[in-house]
Amino acid sequence: MPLEMDQKISKHTFGCQRSSTSDDDSGCAMEEYTWVPPGLRPEQVQLYFACLPEEKVPYVNSVGEKCRIKQLLYQLPPHDNEVRYCQSLSEEEKKELQMFSAQRKKEALGRGNIKMLSRAVMHAMCEKCGEKINGGEIAIFVSRAGPGVCWHPSCFVCSTCNELLVDLIYFYQDGKIHCGRHHAELLKPRCSACDEIIFADECTEAEGRHWHMNHFSCYECETVLGGQRYIMKDGRPFCCGCFESHYAEYCESCGEHIGVDHAQMTYDGQHWHATETCFSCAQCKVSLLGCPFLPKKGRIYCSKACSLGEDVHASDSSDSAFQSARSRESRRSVRMGKSSRSADQCRQSLLLSPALNYKFPGMSGNADDTLSRKMDDLSISRQGAGFDNDFWKARDEQETPEDHEEWAEHDDYMTQLLLKFGEKGLFQQAPEDNRSNEHWMSDNIKGKNDLQRNSRNQSLASKKYQSDMYWAQSQDGLGDSAYGSHPGPASSRKLQELDMDHGASGYMHEKMPWYKRSLECLSDNLKPQNENICDSMDSLALSNITGASVDRENKPRPSLFSYQNFQDLNTRDCEKMSNMGTLNSSMLNRSTESLKSLNSEICQEKPPPEEKPMHTSALRRSKSQTRPQVKFSDDVIDNGDCGSIDIRQPPMSERSRRRVYNFEERSQRPHHHRRRKSRKSRSENALHLATESKPSGRERNPRFYTAEDYEKLFHNRSAHEVQAYIQNADLFGQYPNAASNFGLPSQVVDKFLGLYGEDEDSWCSTCSSSSSDSEEEGYFLGQPIPKPLPQRYQYFSDDLCSPTNALSSSQFSQRTTKSKKKKGHKGKNCIIS
């Protein structure tokens, strides 16, 4: 019943039914089918077609009928058997075709026999699928394979194409059944162009297929490709010209055809010439052959920075952090009103300077001139004359129309700024003769000073190549605000970095950073004419592009250069970088390097022998110790005779952030018997070098000395004392780890020589072995004898081979006479063995 329903549905679906009653091989009238197996009864025919897929059943005017016709033409090609269906065979090939067809029919051709297995057969197996065929089921037997070999009706397929053998016609070869097409191909090659068997002796074989010699041609122009280059496209051969005109790809970079001779790179449907110019970064044009790349919006890039459109040529490898950090810090900057260019433009113009060496300013350009300028800035007369007047007021009064031809020729903004302001007020001091004060200088230094004086009349061409000096000035003098940076996250991170470095080794804090020497708590009118050579971190934090703060534009300008060893500049820690890519101003001007043997040529006189020398051990401090701080804070300054001082404080919104760092937790050792001070009060400017208060809490009022006091004291000294002091300066200049500010023969140090009459924490009992308790031994002609700052002697044990040889006892015989020292307060610079 289901079979009848299926037949009715099939008839209604295709809209027709068999009306002919022709006789078939079975001798039965099968009106429904175009073909039925021969020798079967109608019920057996129905059982056979029931085993086949529905689309393969050859119903009249059905899909199965069309499929049968198609398979007849494909599996049994007529041109494989009949000469009349062939196109261009020679007489010899025709004869060979006839012989070939007859041989196949004789040796391999056959038709399958459909039989119903008896119920007694128990072990029949399908040759194709290997499954058991039960008794009473339909099976197909092949006489050429033997009596016991059988297949399921649905498994009787060609061994090559797995298609049902049309009308059960097979060709048996080597134990397998094939359709007529694939059986012929087992014996002879077939032409891929004309689909005929190739009987000729020569043929063309390509891509695993065969062609007649004249049939292997271009699919478009039919040019014979035998022995020539060709390109296969969709199974069809093309000559190079036709392929390029119809199927060649276009390069995404240059837009030209990618020829067959050119290698190409393909990604996501895009094509490039496999060359360094075409397959390269779309932004920086660097070659990407053999390199990973970043695809974005149909283009390829070498990095994420290029994909974002950043100009990599405007920066170097150390500038990537600079760009990101400066963009955040630029919103916190205070710019000068005349500055119309952005901080990023200033940075780029400086980084692109041709002769720039920002790590070592004295190593590029004219190094001799740079050293001469440094030394001339440090001379006493220049410092005395350069800061007698208020600098910024003097600059405003002396400001004249600039020479356009001199500074306007520079594209570099920082060079324009320094040419415009530097030589006219910032770096130009009063041109008074200072040779009278150069008696303490060596011939080599004097020669360099003469060279500096002669170099003041340089032309503009020579100034163009002094970008190293301008860079150093912009870093030291103008501060970070020239690039739009004020204390913020960067400064905080730098302080944290210094804090962490201190925990590792005390070396960073043993050196004398330049920002430790400021007196911002004092008013501007009380500031002396020549400050210490180093500025403070706080004044740098409020400095704008001209070097003046927002509130304190009338602050005097400090000297720009540290008096350090010029030959050892490249071996020092000047390469410390801030977290924004530029030289950290707080690290650049370390004054621990001294100029070697400054007075070694002229200061060879020995002290009078009648003074008994006292061998004093070299003052050494361990690297974990930190420097004691001497600074007048706001609460200390308002007492005594300083209560009437008019202190000008900036508003709270513009004060730089300060952070207190206590290093007591970092390195506490039993022999460190001294008070520690936070970084907030760490300022060792020469103006602040007053004595510390006693443990009882009694505070001293600061004493201030003017230039007249200094000159009186200096001229009242005897030649012996001056010579001894000069030798001390020579001695401390020989060791690079000694603080350079002591050896510096500047007005800053000598002005306050009388400030250290009594310092109860300066020397410990072990270093001060004098038995004299007289109060008059520390004075000469009514003036206190100058004493060195104990905290300034930074000697490490590895730098001095012999403490006794390093410090002659005669030089310290006058400085160790004070015995009013409490034994409970050990010296800050001594190690108790």
From Swiss-Prot:
Write the record's keywords in alphabetical order, separated by commas.
Answer: Cell membrane, Developmental protein, Gastrulation, LIM domain, Lipoprotein, Membrane, Metal-binding, Methylation, Prenylation, Repeat, Zinc
Q: Name all PET domain ranges.
A: 14-122
> Ranges for the LIM zinc-binding domain?
124-188, 189-249, 250-313
The protein's location, in the record's own words, is: Cell membrane
Q: Which domain of life is it from?
A: Eukaryota
| A Gene Ontology term for the protein's cellular component | plasma membrane
Q: Which Pfam families match?
A: LIM, PET
- GO molecular-function terms, A-Z: zinc ion binding
- For region Disordered, the annotated ranges are 1-22, 312-346, 432-456, 603-702, 767-786, 805-833
Q: Which residues carry this modification: Cysteine methyl ester?
A: 830
GO biological process terms on file: anterior/posterior axis specification; convergent extension involved in gastrulation; establishment of planar polarity
Q: Main role? A: Acts in a planar cell polarity (PCP) complex; polarization along the apical/basal axis of epithelial cells. Regulates the polarized assembly of fibronectrin on the surface of the mesoderm during gastrulation. Essential for gastrulation cell movements, cooperating with dvl2/dsh to activate jnk. Acts together with tes to control axial elongation.
**Similarity annotation:** Belongs to the prickle / espinas / testin family.
Q: How does it assemble?
A: Interacts with dvl2/dsh and mapk8/jnk1.
Name of the protein in question: Prickle-like protein 1
User: Organism, per UniProt?
Assistant: Xenopus tropicalis
Give the classification, highest ranks: Eukaryota, Metazoa, Chordata, Craniata, Vertebrata
